Regions:
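Active-site/ligand-binding loops adjacent to catalytic centers
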Residues: 1-60, 96-98
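Phosphate-binding loop/pocket of nucleotide- and phosphate-handling active sites
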Residues: 10, 18-19, 23-25, 67-98
Length: 98
């Protein structure tokens, strides 16, 4: 909820909803057309799917990116969406995450 309402919320995704709002969002909030929410459990599940199906060793924020890109594509009936996976999976090598 940080980006939507500026409040700290519960999460499993480092850097999301922990009180941190990126400066670029603060400066350009009026330009946002839409904010897509992704539950932590969904993001972790997608992180696992990306590793198992595509061999992409990423973290849960990348799982959230993938889900948001998929939702964006479906909502707006667009063919291609580009996103960046900006985290690595090495921090998440333990039974809790895998």
């Amino acid at each position: 909820c940080t980006i939507l309402c500026g409040e700290i919320g519960k999460h499993l995704i480092e850097g999301i909803a922990d009180g941190f709002v990126p400066g670029i969002i603060e400066r350009h909030r009026a330009l946002l057309d839409e904010v897509i929410t992704v539950e932590s459990a969904e993001a972790v599940q997608e992180m696992r799917r990306l590793a198992q199906k595509h061999g992409l060793f990423v973290g849960p924020s990348s799982g959230a990116h993938m889900i948001a890109a998929r939702k964006l594509r479906e909502r707006h009936k667009i063919e291609h969406v580009v996103t960046f996976f900006c985290d690595k999976g090495e921090k998440y090598i333990n039974d809790y995450w895998l």
